[in-house]
Amino acid sequence: MGIDRRPLAIAVMGPTASGKTATAIALAKQLDGEIVSVDSALVYRHLDIGSAKPDAAERAQAPHHLLDLRDPWQTYSAAEFAADAGRVVADIVARGKTPILAGGTGLYFRALLQGLSPMPEADPVMREALSTEAAERGWAALHAELAKVDPAAAARIHATDPQRIQRALEVYRLTGTPISEWQRRPGVAPLPVRTLKLILAPRDRAVLHQRIEARFDAMLAQGFLDEVRALRAMPEMAAVTAPLDLPAVRAVGYRQAWEYLDGEGDAARFRDKAIFATRQLAKRQLTWLRGELDARWFDPHVDGERLAGAVSTFVAR
């Protein structure tokens, strides 16, 4: 087998609250690299505290890319991300640096490392119709409908993942072709890099749950609710007829905060709902990550030396 001469990239993957930001910064310093965010919440301006977006001190330690690309009332597709990330990675490589792809959005990672099928663009009218149906029937009913027209997609998409249910049904209703079929068609090519996939996750699930809870309490102390109040006060957000359908507001924590500020439940109930939703997100992320068969798993708080050794070995190849 010949030598793989493609440029090197490091993918730092993992569930929420697993330590990806700190690890990515450490690797960027070790490899003279630059960090490319692979996170669907971090593309939105004004979503800082609740998204755990790297702060000014963290950004000062290494260059960061693909943060703050859109306003919260706008949308941003996986195809747009793949195009933007492709340009950024090409520029990083051209300057002799190492791209550090860091985040927890599985669709974005698949778009980068496996390519993206040429699916139709989002249709606001269809999305609004699906949201109205969900309000009347519930997302579980729409998931059951998806299972009838696209069993393969329904098997991959959890019944509590409204954004992906909506997208799958949107594509089917617009084209008459299941999204699983679209995903098999050639489209955007994967990045022309050789990639070391690192998955960060505590060995003990209870430890991850504790970190999620502690981090959310820290976000509350930092002013997360005030951040959401400021979002709600923006004229552009106030003009949106169904703000809970916006991808930015659907982000874990933001949706629960929005509902709380709408008068749903008390502060304790809001906290419990947000922490539960974050744990469910972590569960879905771990399910996706277990399918990454060519990845290396590490507990960043235990396996620091082993992780550094794996990176050094890969780079030296």
Curated annotation (Swiss-Prot):
Sorted UniProt keywords: ATP-binding, Magnesium, Nucleotide-binding, Transferase, tRNA processing
Q: What cystine linkages occur within this chain?
A: none
Task: Spell out the subunit comment.
Answer: Monomer.
Q: What is this protein's name?
A: tRNA dimethylallyltransferase
Cofactor section: Mg(2+)
Question: Does Hydrolase show up as a keyword for this record?
Answer: no
Ranges for the region named Interaction with substrate tRNA are 39-42, 163-167
Taxonomically, the superkingdom here is Bacteria
What is the name of the gene encoding this protein? Answer: miaA
Task: List the source organism.
Answer: Stenotrophomonas maltophilia (strain K279a)
